[in-house]
C-alpha cells in the first residue's frame, strides 16, 4: 500500500490504477474534455490508449456516457450520477 501511495506523488503508470479508478478517471476527464480526440490526448499521460478506449466503450455500453456527434462524448448525468472523485485521483484530473 505504501508503494502505491508513493507512486501517486512520483508519477503514475497505468498498472497502478484499479479498474474502477480507471473508469472514474475517464468519466471525470470526459466532463472536463468532451472532445474525444482531446480527451484521449490528455489521458494518455496516465492511461494506455487501449485502457481509455475500453473504458469509453464500457461507459457508453452502461449508458453512463453518451456519444453526441462523431467526436463528442458527454456524461449521461440524467441517467446516472457522476461517481465521486477519490482524493488520490483529484490532482490527476486537475492536471490533465
Regions found by a protein language model. Name each.
Residues 71-77:
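Minor-groove-contacting beta-hairpin "wing" of winged helix-turn-helix DNA-binding domains
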Residues 60-71:
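A short, conserved structural fragment
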Residues 46-61:
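Short amphipathic alpha-helical interaction segments
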Residues 2, 10, 20-22, 26, ...:
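Generic short amphipathic/hydrophobic targeting helices enriched at N-termini
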Residues 15-44:
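Short amphipathic alpha-helical interface segments
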Residues 79-96:
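Short, amphipathic alpha-helical interaction segments positioned at domain boundaries
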Residues 1-15, 92-95:
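Long, low-complexity, charged/polar intrinsically disordered regions in eukaryotic proteins
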Amino acid at each position: 500500500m505504501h508503494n502505491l501511495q508513493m507512486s501517486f506523488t512520483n508519477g503514475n503508470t497505468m498498472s497502478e490504477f484499479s479498474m474502477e479508478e480507471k473508469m472514474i478517471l475517464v468519466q471525470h476527464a470526459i466532463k472536463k474534455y468532451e472532445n474525444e480526440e482531446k480527451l484521449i490526448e490528455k489521458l494518455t499521460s496516465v492511461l494506455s490508449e487501449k485502457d481509455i478506449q475500453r473504458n469509453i466503450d464500457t461507459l457508453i455500453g452502461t449508458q453512463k456516457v453518451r456519444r453526441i456527434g462523431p467526436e463528442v462524448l458527454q456524461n449521461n448525468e440524467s441517467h446516472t450520477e457522476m461517481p465521486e472523485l477519490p482524493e488520490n485521483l483529484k490532482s490527476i484530473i486537475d492536471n490533465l
